[in-house]
From Swiss-Prot:
Stated name of the protein: Glutamyl-tRNA reductase
Swiss-Prot/TrEMBL keywords: Chlorophyll biosynthesis, NADP, Oxidoreductase, Porphyrin biosynthesis
GO BP annotations listed: chlorophyll biosynthetic process; protoporphyrinogen IX biosynthetic process
Annotated residues for binding of NADP(+): 189-194
Top-level taxonomic group: Bacteria
Function, as annotated: Catalyzes the NADPH-dependent reduction of glutamyl-tRNA(Glu) to glutamate 1-semialdehyde (GSA).
Species: Microcystis aeruginosa (strain NIES-843 / IAM M-2473)
Amino acid sequence: MNIAVVGLSHKTAPVEIREKLSIPEAKIESALTHLKGYPHIQEVAIISTCNRLEIYAVVTDTEKGVVEITQFLAEIGHIPLNVLRRYLFTLLHQDAVRHLLRVSAGLESLVLGEGQILAQVKNTHKLAQKYNTISQLLDRLFKQAMTAGKRVRTETSIGTGAVSISSAAVELAHAKVTDLSSKKIAIIGAGKMSRLLVTHLLAKGSQQIAIINRSQRRAQELAREFPHLPLQLYGLEEMMTTVAASDIVFTSTGATEPILTKTLLTEVTITANSLMLIDISVPRNVHTDVKELAQVQAFNVDDLKAVVAANQESRRQMAREAEALLEQEVEAFELWWRSLDTVPTISCLRSKIEDIREQELEKALSRLGTEFAEKHQEVIEAMTRGIVNKILHEPMVQLRAQQDIEARKRCLQSLQMLFNLSVGEEYS
């Protein structure tokens, strides 16, 4: 068996490809079930964010398992395989392990060190557990990744002052118009990203902010987090009139199709000399045809790279500190994985000794007579179990701790020969 990851990210694919392969949480269950149904995939988990889609799998045949995942991606994205392969990356075993730990630590993010990805990794693990598509290997790997992500944030300074997608979007707007305090701003969406947008806009002095959202309850919840700011709340039926009256519009919704198009914008009268649309959603909320309108400037997540780059150089030394720490976590996972080849032998030996214990206990109790056996069986049972456990404990600890692969293999072979054990090789 092997661990593989097949995916694409902001580093390998533009937003127009990423949005085709984005899997919303509502469709994760069916995607996981579909993947688990392939003959060479034993465990599977999916990370799907605006900047990456990565499928982690335990495969019984590496080449065939990778082909199955690639075929799945081509099908859901309706992208020909020969086109899709240009944008995909595939990593195996230790490289796949290291990659997930780097993702969890924010080292693979568009915004180096950003913290939101750790929560997304946790959610990936939770969903895979919920839908029963991970078992021993991926469960341990994701737990190791979450530990690594937490350690990087507590033991290094990489998360300090990190920009986020939301803050980068506000910085982009600020760079284009300089004075945000005088601008009318609309935010379409009322989720976490929208809340962060409001926070960063307030820091830039913005006061005229409107929230447009399908659910008024969620919009009101967001507004309650900013009691000193008179946020204006609108439903989707007022979206276009609110957009037309704004100078800058941020979009951050879970819509799978564009909600702002050239056609919709031409149907309203734009009051500003120039309307700036900044779309931080994947799939995109703003259609590319809006750029054909003279009054409109449109940007998406890929346009944030220049803003982020200015923040990156000062963080590279911090990233090197984090990488050293991550190597410790990679090694910890590798040691655990290598120790799995001892499990079948240990289980087989324990089972054989337990059979002997039960047989000898039954003989002893029959000799002691019914009355004595009934009165003292529990004590005798506990004593014999204790003897077995104490005899096995030290050899088992030493066997698991043996880091030299060849030395451990010789120990296992000796045990199998001396005790006449028939052992499969489930994890080797």
